[in-house]
């Protein structure tokens, strides 16, 4: 089974546009959702869509992309998922750093992590670093820092 290369896709003018890393605007991640897709098949995709839509509405309220725009973005992302291979798409709502800039939608088509039959866990003993534990996305950097520290201690993941 092949693994497609990573892609960054920005939603602009009703379509997904491929971005290079150098084209990324500085932004704060407000909400995200990701899932495993194997050969074009995903379990509970509608639940991922609903969780993302709920997070978007909670994060930006009246400024949220209206439902038809969010639905069009979601449909375009699903259509962009390769029919073959192991991918781990992630959808994102971002707030640009530039003053007055509107929130933006982005997708990342990433290779899926390797399957494992076991892994080593490390327990985090400090305070919970998350600021919004009920939302997926805003605390992603904090969670990556925990995982990186756990990996430095010989574990695979932090809990």
Q: Where are these predicted regions, by residue range?
A:
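Helix-start/capping segments and mature chain N-termini
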Residues: 1-75, 96-159
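Short secondary-structure junctions
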Residues: 79-88, 152-154
